[in-house]
Every structure is written in structure tokens, then in C-alpha cells.
Amino acid sequence: SPTHPKQYSMLSSNKNILETLSVLRQHGVHDFVLCPGSRNAPISHSVCQIEDFCAHTATDERSAGFMALGMALATHTPVAVVVTSGSALANLYPAACEAFYQHAPLVFISADRPAAWIGQMDGQTMPQEGALGKMVKMSVSLPEDNLWHANRLLNEAMLACKDRLPQGPVHINIPISEPVYKFNAKALPDARGIRLRNISPWHKTPENEQDCLVLPQGRTLIVIGQLHITEQAVPFILQQVSANFRIVAENLSKTPTPDCTNPCQIDWTRMKRVDCLITLGGHIVNKELKEFFRKHRPKEHWHVSPDGAVA
């Protein structure tokens, strides 16, 4: 039955749990079906303290999976299922199969033991990453020592679940080291959310206002990575925007236009912070350019690509 708890208790101190819930909230997840267990207790407890979330309970994981499936099909929004470690995850396989072929946006969240404990005769342990096989569009296991990487994996999973058609189930595995039951966080972090937008071809005018992308205020820089010589429209487009934006082009970009600056010609130690970074093309080779943006992260990063890859 659904419950709407009040804000009266602390959230888990585990950074990956907080990051997961923050990213899911940004991607529109509202309903969670919670299953019993000890390793997943800090996830379930935290869900029940957040006003934006609605918690439902089911004692059997197989039933929980199909309960969430029905909710996702009825609401056309992603629904999450939270289970503990070990064979509890395997009980979600029937619902994963059904969701995969019905293109239902389900998010299977499994708590896990630390990776070093797997295969060491510890209770309720098994290899959980990829346990749902080909019946999920994406399966990720969050690294415990790299929050930025965990955030990227979470966003990629949610984009695969709801934005990359057809929709379908994904699996997020969260290894949780001791202390498991430590609760001292007052609120969710403002985690980075990655959006996927389909835009009109460059030669077409957007049909409505929603198709227009609005740049944030501040300094915008366009960086061009490796391109194929066949992408002949790029120089023309750059010529149109060069009056308003600075353009930096790698040698591998093959963009013979005077409107572009080679990154080797820039003193990156004196470069001012950029508010919006727009990238297109493939690999960036220049080391100073990459180090600058890793140290001085822009407020927004737009990556333009045919397949909407996260970079």
C-alpha cells in the first residue's frame, strides 16, 4: 500500500545512495516499490523520508516486479523497485522479461556487498552486475570510490530507460560497504542531471518554442573534436555562429576555417572560466584543454552527436 511519510528523519550517509535517489528524482521517478532486506535498508529508509517519493511495499520480489510493471504501464513514467543483495535480485527476472518486451520503463535497484566480498563465502552474495542478462537495456554497478563516475552511470541508465526509444528496464547495482546503517544526511545532494534533446536539422526552422534550445547567460565556448571529412555542413554552420561565439577546433576536426582557433594557440593558464561548453565531434587530444575543463567545470555542457552519446 502507498505511504506518504513526513520529513522527520535523517537520510543515509552513503554517497552513492544519495546520488542515486537525487538522479532518479531529476529523471521523474516518483514511485518506489520496496522489498524487505538488510543490505537495502538504507535505500528504503531514505526513500521513505523524501516528500517527492511515494513508497509502496511488497514482501515478495517477484510480486514487487510485476506491481511496478503495472504502475509503469499505467502512468507512462519510470518506476523503481528496490531489493536486497543475493538471490532477491534473481526474483525480478520474470518482471524484467515482461518489461523488456512491453517497453516499460522500470528501474531495478539492487543493494550489494562490496566487490571484495563476492565469492568469499559471505552470506547473500553473488555476482549481481549483469544478473538480469539481456532482459534489461543497461546494467550498471556503481563504483564506491568515484562519485562523478557513478553519476555518469546513473544518468546513462536513466536515459536508456526512458529517453532512448524504445523504453525499457534497466538495472542499477549499489555496493554498500560498512557502516551500512549510518544516517546523518539532512537532504539529497543537487546531483548533476543529464538530459537528452532531439533537435531539428540545421537547415530547418524549429516548429515550436519547445524545440528551441536557450543558452545560459555567460561565456560560451564551442570545442570541436575529431570529425570525418564528409561532414561538410560543419564549416558552414561554424561560419554562421563565429561572430557570437569563440570556436576551438582540434587538428583532427578537419575544419579548415579561419573562424576557429587551434587549442595549441591558447594559453590555458590565463583562460577565463566558461559558463557553457558546447562540444561536437569525437575525441579531444589536446591535454591542456581537457585538464582545464576537468579543473574548471562549466555550469552546463552540451554535447552534440547523432546518437546522443553521453560525454
Locate predicted features.
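Short beta-strand segments
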Residues: 82-84, 105-112, 133, 143, ...
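Thiamine diphosphate
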Residues: 41-115
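Glycine-rich phosphate/diphosphate-binding loops that line cofactor/substrate pockets in enzymes
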Residues: 19-29, 71-76, 158-166, 209-220, ...
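Conserved thiamine diphosphate
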Residues: 124-168
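Glycine-rich, anion-gripping cofactor-binding loops and their flanking helix/strand elements
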Residues: 91, 224-306, 310
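Short glycine-rich anion-binding loops that position phosphate/pyrophosphate groups of nucleotides
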Residues: 38-40, 84-88, 112-114, 175-179, ...
